[in-house]
Regions:
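Short beta-strand immediately N-terminal to the Walker A/P-loop
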Residues: 31-32, 68
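Non-catalytic connector elements of ABC transporters
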Residues: 231-302
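Helix-to-loop junction immediately C-terminal to a conserved catalytic motif
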Residues: 49
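ABC ATPase nucleotide-binding domains
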Residues: 67, 80-206, 210
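The feature captures the beta-strand-to-loop junction immediately N-terminal to the Walker
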Residues: 34-36
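ABC ATPase nucleotide-binding domain helices that frame the ATP-binding cleft
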Residues: 42-45, 127
C-alpha cells in the first residue's frame, strides 16, 4: 500500500470536520476524494500532505515522498518555466540534469524561458506537474485541479494529466466536487459527506451499485420508494438493483412502455421524466419527444 489511514478524526473546536476516516491507496492507483463544500475533503488532503494535524489517528502511513499540486498550480508568475522548476531543486547537486530530464519528459523544453503568463493553461499544468515531481515524489496530491475551467479546456487537461500520471507511474489522490472529474480520472473514488466516507469503490460500482446514503447525494440516480409488483419484469429488475438505478441505464427499446411527463434539453441529451405504471423516474435519451407521448424503452445491460 502507498497510503493507509485508520480511524482518523479532525475537530475544529466543537466542529468535527472528519470522523473515523479509514482509507487505503495502492501503489499506482488514482483515488478521487469526492465531496461537496464542507464535506472535509480538503482538510483530509491537507492532513495527508502534513500541512494539518489530525485531532486523533490510530495510524497514518505513507510509503513514499509526497508532493502537492495546488488548485491554482502555485507557480511564480515573475519567474520563467525553468526557474519555477529549479525552485523545487534548490538543494539538489545534480539539479541541472534533473531539470533537463523534466523539461524533456513533460515536453516543455521550448517553454523554458517563457514566463507563466505567456503559456497556456495546459502548459502551466505540465510545468506544475514537473515541479511537483521534481524531488522524486511517489504520491501526488491534487487540490481541485480542474475547477474554474471551461468544459473544453477541462476535458483536454484531464486527458493530459491522466496520461502524464500513468507515464510517471505515480500514485495520485485528487479532491474534487465534480463527479465527472472523479469518474473520468479515478481507479477508486472515496465519497465523503459531512466528514464521513460513505463509499469507497471503483467508479462503475459507485454509479451502478451505490448504497442508499450515497444515492441520495450523487447525481443522475433514481431512487424508487413505491411498493412494486415483482411479477413485472421491469420492477423485478429495479428490486435487483436495491431500488436504485441510473438515468443512463435505460434506452429506447420494445419491452416496456412509459409516458413522458417532463423533458429538459441538456445539449447532447434530453432528460426525461417518465411514468411507468405506478412509478415516476428519469432517463437520458438523445432523441426529442413530446410531452404525454408514449415511448417504448428497455434496460441496458452494462
Amino acid at each position: 500500500m502507498m497510503l493507509e489511514i485508520k480511524n482518523l478524526s479532525k475537530n475544529f473546536g466543537k466542529i468535527q470536520a472528519l470522523k473515523n476516516i479509514n482509507l487505503h491507496v495502492k501503489e499506482g492507483e488514482f483515488l478521487s476524494i469526492l465531496g461537496g463544500s464542507g464535506s472535509g475533503k480538503s482538510t483530509l488532503l491537507r492532513i495527508i500532505a502534513q500541512l494539518e494535524q489530525a485531532s486523533s489517528c490510530e495510524f497514518l502511513k505513507c510509503k513514499g515522498e509526497v508532493a502537492m499540486m495546488f488548485q491554482n498550480y502555485a507557480l511564480f508568475p515573475h519567474l520563467n518555466v525553468e526557474k519555477n522548476i529549479l525552485f523545487a531543486l534548490y538543494d539538489k547537486k545534480d539539479k541541472k540534469q534533473i531539470l533537463e530530464d523534466l523539461l524533456k519528459t513533460f515536453e516543455i523544453e521550448n517553454l523554458r524561458y517563457k514566463k507563466i503568463d505567456e503559456i497556456s493553461g495546459g502548459q502551466a499544468q505540465r510545468v506544475a506537474f514537473a515541479r511537483a515531481v521534481a524531488r522524486g515524489c511517489k504520491l501526488l496530491l491534487l487540490d481541485e485541479p480542474f475547477s474554474n475551467l471551461d468544459q473544453n479546456l477541462k476535458q483536454d487537461l484531464r486527458r493530459e494529466l491522466k496520461k502524464l500520471i500513468q507515464k510517471q507511474k505515480i500514485t495520485a489522490i485528487m479532491v474534487t466536487h465534480d463527479i465527472e472529474d472523479a469518474y473520468c480520472m479515478s481507479d477508486k473514488i472515496a465519497f465523503l459527506d459531512k466528514g464521513e466516507i460513505l463509499a469507497h469503490a471503483n467508479p462503475k460500482e459507485l454509479y451502478f451499485k451505490p448504497d442508499f446514503k450515497s444515492a441520495q447525494i450523487l447525481p443522475d440516480l433514481n431512487i424508487i420508494e413505491e411498493k412494486l409488483d415483482l411479477e413485472d419484469e421491469f420492477f423485478a429488475w429495479i428490486a435487483s438493483k436495491n431500488y436504485i438505478f441510473g438515468y443512463a441505464e435505460l434506452k429506447i427499446g420494445n419491452r416496456f412502455e412509459a409516458t413522458i411527463l417532463q423533458k429538459e434539453f441538456l445539449g447532447a441529451f434530453y432528460r426525461l421524466k417518465v411514468r411507468y405504471k405506478n412509478i415516476d423516474f428519469f432517463m437520458l435519451l438523445s432523441s426529442n419527444y413530446n410531452l404525454e407521448e408514449k415511448i417504448n424503452f428497455d434496460i441496458i445491460n452494462f
